[in-house]
Amino acid sequence: MTTTTPIFADVIKQHNKNVKVFPNAINPEEKQYAVAKNPRTDKLRVGIICGSSHLKDLELLSGIATQVNKDKVQFVLCGFDTRGTRTIYKDNGEVETRPIYPQESVWCDYEKIFTDNYRTISPEHKDFLMKYMAGVDDPFTNEPYRRMWTRHINDYATHYQNVDVLIAPLKENDFNKVKSELKEIECGFTHTAFIGQNFGAYTINLVPMIEKGGKINEEGTALLVDSSKNHKQWAKYINKLADDADMLKKLQDNLYNFVKDRYSLAEICKQRVEFYKSIVNKE
């Protein structure tokens, strides 16, 4: 069997000892990973790039919209989507399915977290957001929040054009523990800094630039948040990067240099071929 992390491999080995780890990888020559970042305003663009199943993870950030300096920070929620259906079970036993209303989308729940229920943005911006103009990226580029709609899978990584640092909170549970470090890899190849949960795959090989006690490690590749400090450390690190352009750049460069060869699709495919050949030769 093959899997993507040594953490997941240890779980699988409880049932099958023959496990080989091949991490997720990226082809840097793919067009969506080869685009430069859009020019930024005077705000640090803090990205949230995830799917529709992360509400419990993002709820760890409740209150963050009022903890960061909104004059220096912009949250960019990428992947916004209002598609979906709702099933209604009637008293007479009939079952009815209907398209959801835009405001019923889980993405609106995400949005409320990063706007303090729309209190941190201007009335004009809120009016625009409430129109739910699907596919029209948010033109309010200098507000404390920006909405970016879902994109085709072949253009997914272009979201990173509008992100300086990605945040990846994870609620501690068995499912999240065995996830791969894909977000870390995406950030590296797109020259994006990374703030992640000090849990699961992000503990495999990331080196925190801010160590316990506040010591700075110039070789660090990320900022990692302890689960016991979810209530304050996310905002602390975001505000730090908003004030420290040198640290932001160093994190972006260090992570890129760490992933560019280690997680290249060509390199991982080469490892796969060599492994499969070794199996054939044994037989």
Describe each region flagged by the PLM.
Residues 27-33, 38-161:
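Conserved catalytic-core segment of nucleotide-activated headgroup transferases in glycan assembly
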Residues 4-9, 79-83, 198-201:
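Short, polar loop motifs at secondary-structure junctions
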Residues 229, 233, 243-278:
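A charged, aromatic-enriched C-terminal amphipathic alpha-helix characteristic of glycosyltransferases
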Residues 10-15, 87-90, 203-207:
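Short loop/helix-cap segments at secondary-structure boundaries that form the rim of catalytic
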Residues 1-33:
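Donor nucleotide-sugar binding/catalytic pocket of nucleotide-sugar-dependent glycosyltransferases
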Residues 50-53, 179, 226, 260:
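Glycosyltransferase donor-binding loop in the core domain
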Residues 56, 145, 149-159, 164-189, ...:
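Nucleotide-sugar-dependent
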